[in-house]
Structure formats: C-alpha cells, structure tokens
C-alpha cells in the first residue's frame, strides 16, 4: 500500500479530494500524557491551552476531511486524556462531518491498561508502554459535507446542496 507520512499543514491536502482510504492523525495536544516525564508539560498546562488545542485539532480535521474518500477511515489520536480533546472532538467530527464512530466493545477487552471511553480507547500510562494515548476511529459515511471556495473559508453544505445530485 502507498503511505504518506507528513507534518505539513493539512491545507496542503486540499487538492487531494477523496484520495485517501485511511488517514491517521496524531494531532498536537495539551500533552497530559507527558506529565510523568516532563515537569514543563505540567507547568504549561491550562484550561486555556486545552481549549486552544481542541480548536487547533478541529481545524486540522476539517482541513484533511475532504481528502478522505467516502467510506474511508479516520484514526484520531492524541497523547492527552481530557474529554474536550478526545471524545469531545470525536463527537464534533461525528456531528459536523457526518462521521460514524467505530466502536467494538470486545476489540480491546481484557487488554491491561486499555480503557474504553465513550467514543474511543485510552491507553493508560504506567499500565502500557509509553506515555499513554487516546485513540478513536471514524468512518466517512458520505461525500464531503463542507463546501470550500477560493474566496473564503469552508462552510457547511446547505440541506439543498447536500440533497442535490451531482450533474453528469
């Protein structure tokens, strides 16, 4: 399979509409998973930083979403544990992008250090190798709900635009 690994600005993928079957995002976060090994991470943490990170994560997802093919899978991952950056953003992706969260109750059942959250899984530091992680999977169930124009930011499709069949 073809693989692209990048840390480019996600807007760089705008020309690749529907190109990818799977997109794995490890988005910048407030870094709560780093608290055990980095005292500075603890000192820099704040509710304002969590809000800033959650907003940044949504922009990243909104920018890459059009490049995910209908039926494609988005893996959303952070190294933090707060609900705003994890299940809160997964819920936002589901509601705003029309994505279907993919959860299997028995997928990771019984694995030490893995906790099922509302919409994903948390790997608990100290119980798994590494500093911990939160991960969710979502399926893109339809064509892009966002309309992009050269003159402005993305906007949500209207019901009329969504219902309209593409011209042949």
Tell me the role of every PLM-derived stretch.
Residues 1-18, 25:
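S-adenosyl-L-methionine
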Residues 21-62, 79-86:
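Mobile active-site "lid"/loop adjacent to the S-adenosyl-L-methionine
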Residues 48, 56, 87-109:
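Conserved Class I S-adenosyl-L-methionine
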Residues 68-70:
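Helix-to-beta-strand junctions that scaffold the AdoMet/dcAdoMet cofactor pocket
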Residues 73-78:
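Conserved beta-strand signature within the Rossmann-like core of class I S-adenosyl-L-methionine
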Residues 101-129:
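Class I S-adenosyl-L-methionine
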